[in-house]
Amino acid sequence: MKTSEFKTDIFNLFDQKWAVLTADTPDRWNAMTISWGSMGTIWGYPQNGRPIVTVYVDPLRYTYEVLNQSDSFTVSFFPEERRKDLIMMGSRSGRNGDRLKGSGLTPVNNHGFVTYKEAELTFECRKLFQQTLDNVTPHFKVPGYRRYAANWSSEN
């Protein structure tokens, strides 16, 4: 789908839907639920910006390790009736076992990107930039901030 055909309110996707971030390739991948992220454009003139997705991942998460070694990731959004499956994905670590098992989600390889048959919307992203958030302004920092001190921006 072309970005000009996209009719979803991107400002509410992360707030109102549950999402799964999936990193790496179908041979070696891991997924986690996410609720912090944003979408927009960068490096372009009006009508010609590069679409990006930015996600924030706790450095203690196993997906953080996998994402560090990957040049791509997907962000998949699911309908409300899949919330129970996503709770399963968000409650276990991929480091210690298969969190997909028992979730009811079906992974699909889409040209080297892992998505899910049950997803209603998936962004396939190539990593463009990553950094820790150590230098954010003091008013941004909230209790528990240190745990959420990394992010990735990508071109999709």
Placement of each model-derived feature along the sequence:
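Basic, polyanion-binding surface patches
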Residues: 1-156
